[in-house]
Amino acid sequence: MVVSMREGEIISLFMKHFERHSLGDDAGFIKLNNSWLLVTSDMLVWKTDVPDFMTPEDAGRKVVTMNVSDIAAMGGRPMAFFFSLAVPGDVSEDILRGIARGINEGSKVYKLKIVSGDTNEADDIIIDGGSLGIGKRLLLRSNAKPGDLVCVTGDLGRPLTALLLWMRGEKIPREIEEKARNPRARVEEGVKLSSLANSAIDISDGLSKELWEIANASNVRIIIEEERLPISDSVKEIVSDPVKVALASGEEFELLFTIPREKVEELDIDFKIIGRVEGGNGVYIKRGRKIEELEVLGWEHLAGGIDVEL
């Protein structure tokens, strides 16, 4: 019997069958003396993850960044990258060379050693990447505390804006396209956060979804303020509802984190305070004087992709 299931439901189904695991965060973890070995994997599928404004080199870099970002969100420093590649039998050599160059470039940016690989045949190009890292103190989604401030690195909205413009066949401004084609994982920020923050997650599926992930995992209530969202100026100039785009934009690879109020001044990174953590449940957004429950927006595999328009 075939049943339509969403990505989160499939993950939950598998976790119910695993008796020993450290799943449920951006990366798995194993204790090694005074440190933690961090392990993650993340897959790129050409049809859904590589719009044609991206090059094969972009795709290769992206699969490295996707995996490194998971290590960064746990407060770790990535050390190695590995991947499996499945391709159709008629794939062009130019595409393969481009992917290889991109993976190499990404590994150099993050100072990674490429340690393993495998190839197979499939109907689409699939790059299943993975990364290993080391962390001293783990940042978990499940450790947000009432009284924490909710913060985010960088700016939001550009990757989704690029995708929406592309879907409409419109020209993508260079500043918008730049982050969609070549995002950077916040490795140094994650390492600095590891000694100060209580919880963290990377923004791969959209700010809204990641806020709900932290709130549910930590059993807390999160309230963010609309006017505090760090929305890119270039996004504000293009889209009709920049707040909705910022909340839904995935593949940002920024870090969303919660931190005790008294430790904020110790942070030497670029970030914005967007809200607070309270006792209770759920995620809410303050719009002027009104507070309402935050809609879950963002990318959803197996459910039609994105649910936002320009």
Swiss-Prot record:
Substrate binds at D49, E251, W299. It is an enzyme of class 2 (transferase). InterPro entries: PurM-like_C_dom, PurM-like_C_sf, PurM-like_N, PurM-like_N_sf, ThiL-like. It holds the Pfam family AIRS_C. GO terms for biological process: thiamine biosynthetic process; thiamine diphosphate biosynthetic process. Pathway: Cofactor biosynthesis; thiamine diphosphate biosynthesis; thiamine diphosphate from thiamine phosphate: step 1/1. Mg(2+) 5 binds at D205. Keywords: ATP-binding, Kinase, Magnesium, Metal-binding, Nucleotide-binding, Thiamine biosynthesis, Transferase. ATP binds at G117, D118, R141, S204. This is Thiamine-monophosphate kinase. It comes from Pyrococcus abyssi (strain GE5 / Orsay). The gene is thiL.
